[in-house]
Each structure stands twice: as structure tokens, then as C-alpha cells.
A protein has these predicted regions:
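Short secondary-structure boundary segments
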Residues: 40, 121-122, 151-152
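Structural beta-alpha unit
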Residues: 1-4, 17, 31, 78-117
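A short acidic, glycine-rich active-site loop
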Residues: 58-75
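Small/aliphatic-rich secondary-structure junction motif
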Residues: 2-59
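Generic structural signal for helix capping and beta-alpha/helix-loop junctions
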Residues: 45-46, 101-104, 126
Length: 152
């Protein structure tokens, strides 16, 4: 039995901190022989910026917004896979989700049976953390596997 995880899940949002997490996850994956999976969680805006006054309940508008969010997720994931490839690593799977990042990251980790989640931390201030919470804090609290939070 190995002490190393067989699957590592990298959670990314394309930020500078996520790039640091990507480097750590790719390095760990390569050195331990673990599969590397990447997840990006897009969000669905509650209002439309293209049609002021339109609500998210409009099925056509909701579909277009969802397609836009899914395209954003695919673009982000493609860029992350290329970054891992440039560092000599390989991505075993990509996962695009829409929703709350913390819940979706933990959900994907559970689906995969990931042995480690790697993500960056933005170091939000105490007021923002109190009002909105921190994705990394929430993932650490709710994940069913170890979590590596990479800071600058």
C-alpha cells in the first residue's frame, strides 16, 4: 500500500494562486505517479447583463448563459492542461462544473475517489471571509481527503 494518493484533484480558477497550485499538483503527480485531474467551477450569474430586466427564469436566456459558462470552463481547462503539459506532466481527466466552487470541488473529489485536493489561496481579508467565506477554507472543512492549500 502506497502512502501517496493514486488520484490528485487540482482545483483551478486561472488566478495567479491557482497557477502556483498547478505547479505543485503537476510536480506531486509526476513524482508520485498519481493521476492528475483538473476541475474548474464556473458560475451562473443571477441576472443577465445583455438584457437588463430579463430574469434567469427565461429558459432561452438561461440556456444561453449556461452555454457561455460551459464554454468559459472548457477554455479554462484547455489552458490548464496545456500548462501541465509544458511542465512535462499529464492530465488524466478534466471536469467542468457550474455552481458553488467549494461544494463542486468536494463533489468531484468524492466522485473520483481523489486522495488529495490541491488548490490556491487568495488570502482574502477577514471582512470578506466573514461575509462570503473562503473557498479554500470550506474545501478544507468539508473534503473527505487531505487538502493542500498553496499560498504565494
Amino acid at each position: 500500500m502506497s502512502i501517496f494518493p493514486t488520484k490528485i484533484l487540482l482545483a483551478t480558477d486561472g488566478s495567479k494562486e491557482a497557477q502556483l497550485a498547478l505547479a505543485s499538483a503537476a510536480d506531486l503527480s509526476e513524482k508520485t505517479g498519481s493521476e492528475l485531474h483538473v476541475v474548474y467551477v464556473g458560475h451562473m450569474p443571477l441576472v443577465s447583463y445583455e438584457s437588463p430586466g430579463a430574469t434567469i427564469l427565461d429558459p432561452d436566456l438561461r440556456r444561453r448563459m449556461q452555454e457561455g459558462a460551459e464554454q468559459e470552463a472548457r477554455t479554462m481547462l484547455e489552458a490548464q492542461v496545456q500548462q501541465v503539459g509544458k511542465s512535462g506532466g499529464e492530465v488524466a481527466g478534466v471536469h467542468a462544473r457550474l455552481g458553488r466552487p467549494d461544494a463542486e470541488i468536494v463533489g468531484v473529489a468524492d466522485e473520483l475517489g481523489a486522495g488529495l485536493i490541491v488548490l490556491g489561496s487568495r488570502g482574502v481579508g477577514p471582512l470578506r471571509r466573514a461575509l462570503m467565506g473562503s473557498v479554500s477554507d470550506s474545501v478544507v472543512r468539508h473534503a473527505h481527503c487531505p487538502v493542500l492549500v498553496v499560498r504565494e
